[in-house]
Amino acid sequence: MKKKMLLSIIFILSLIPMCFSQYGSEKGVEEVSGIINLTNPLGIIAVILYFAGIWINFKKEKINKCLPYIGMVGIILSELINLLTWGYPSTSYLDGIKNCFSRVFPMFYVGLIISVILIFVYRTIDKNFNRGSK
């Protein structure tokens, strides 16, 4: 139970950067919150899979091991997909990608890095708790 609570709290803390503005052309003028990463279908499914893998006891232990990782990777993919698809119409696909990278606030990168670090933190906590329970 202690491990489940710790992993849940760490995951929720890793989502804090999404509460800040991550996309836009200028601070205070046009800002898009990182919450859109969680409200798209991939983000919603990723969060559900993460918590399902932690809190639901499946018959096969591999499912409990895999679901949180799938959820964490899903959050990262959700962030990257939103980066590349949020909206500035352009004349070509290449211009659209240039616009996306030029109109990202630093908190996007902070959130992305924290999401990647979360995978390693999760693995460390999971290994340490498993070692202690044997």
Label the model's feature ranges:
Residues 9-20, 74-82, 114:
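Alpha-helical transmembrane segments of multi-pass integral membrane proteins
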